[in-house]
A protein has these predicted regions:
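A conserved beta-strand-loop-helix scaffold within acyl/acetyltransferase catalytic domains
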Residues: 17, 21-45, 50, 58-73, ...
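Conserved acetyl-CoA-binding loop-helix of GNAT-fold acetyltransferases
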Residues: 83, 89-106, 236, 242-255, ...
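Short hairpin/turn module used for nucleic-acid contact or packing/dimerization
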Residues: 242, 255-297
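Short amphipathic alpha-helix that is part of the acyltransferase structural core
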Residues: 1-34, 41, 45-49, 146, ...
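A structural microfeature
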Residues: 56, 144-147, 222
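Acyl-donor-binding surface of acyltransferase catalytic domains
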Residues: 97-168, 269, 276, 286-295
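Short, high-confidence coil segments that cap the C-terminus of an alpha-helix
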Residues: 43, 108-109, 262
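A short, internal acetyl-CoA/4′-phosphopantetheine-binding micro-motif in the GNAT/acyltransferase core
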Residues: 78-88, 118, 231-242, 271
Length: 297
């Protein structure tokens, strides 16, 4: 068992891509885990090796999470964990986890969550059932279900003109965001949806065509973003819900996805009732969000 170092990176990247093909091109976090630099102290990586051959890897990130652990200070997220098939059920994963947990406890971290920057927001029950069994054995508990959904765009009526006219009569305007409104969006997210505050730059990086906002009295009260075939995030100020704002923002975003040539929209970490009711979206993946308390809370 070894702490990940820069010399391990080439083999670690190949190992991760083989274990999780979708991570190709998105493995920058490995450099953080291996750097040993103070600014990356919150990125931890362990490898298991047989001689010079890498047979297991475990990476965690330590950060404050206002969604999963509001007001609890830094917690840990499991970014990636994998063991070579030939070395499974030989205690490799258990040893890696026990060493990582000891490190996190020594840092004063109270809990660990199964939320990855590169794989998924939870543990996919269909693809990673073995991982679920392992995590339960290690003391993790299920906290919530997370859904990915999809909707056929060629079967939807996406016109919002009547709904928008009704909102305008109520003093609410829905429009595509302008560059000059990026700071207002950032402030809105920081206040109303702090867990998405970092998305303000991301969702406008390719221009305002990806983002729609709802405004009342000169202030943003809702937003929706899309990227390629993915819809989201979306959010409406709690006091302004149940007025049809969310559905208008949703349909506008789906129109953008259809205009980019996609016949289906994908919705990650979806509010199942809202999307099923609004656009007859169907569930494509169910994940468990799991947590282990390790800090004696």
């Amino acid at each position: 068992m070894r702490v990940m170092r820069p010399a391990h990176l080439p083999q670690a990247r190949r190992f991760c891509v083989k274990a999780f093909p979708d991570t190709k091109g998105r493995l920058g976090f490995l450099d953080e885990c291996a750097s040993g630099k103070k600014q990356h102290a919150g990125a931890l990586g362990l490898i298991a090796a047989e001689g010079q051959r890498l047979v297991g890897i475990l990476c965690c990130q330590v950060l404050e999470d206002p969604v999963l652990a509001p007001g609890r200070g830094p917690v840990a997220h499991v970014d990636l964990m994998a063991v070579h098939p030939a070395f499974r059920r030989r205690g490799v994963a258990t040893m890696m986890w026990q060493r990582m947990e000891a490190k996190l406890v020594a840092m004063g971290i109270p809990s660990v969550w199964t939320r990855s920057r590169v794989i998924s927001a939870g543990v996919d029950l269909r693809k990673h059932s073995e991982a679920v069994v392992f995590l339960l054995k290690m003391g993790f508990q299920k906290r919530s279900d997370i859904y990915d959904m999809t909707s056929r765009l060629d079967e939807l009526g996406l016109d919002t003109s009547c709904a928008e006219a009704e909102l305008r009569r109520a003093g609410i305007e829905v429009k595509r965001i302008d560059y000059s409104e990026r700071e207002a969006l950032r402030q809105f997210l920081s206040t109303s949806f702090p867990h998405w505050a970092g998305n303000a730059d991301r969702v406008t990086k390719d221009g305002p065509q990806l983002v729609h906002i709802a405004c009342a009295d000169g202030k943003i009260i809702g937003f929706a973003a899309s990227e390629r075939r993915w819809f989201g995030p979306i959010g409406v100020e709690p006091g302004c819900r149940l007025k049809g704002i969310g559905k208008v923002l949703l349909l506008r975003g789906l129109r953008d996805i259809r205009a980019r040539g996609y016949k289906r929209a994908l919705i990650g970490w979806a509010n199942f009732p809202f999307y099923a009711r609004s656009i007859s979206a169907s569930i494509t993946r169910v994940m468990w969000q799991m947590e282990k308390r390790i800090g004696g809370e």
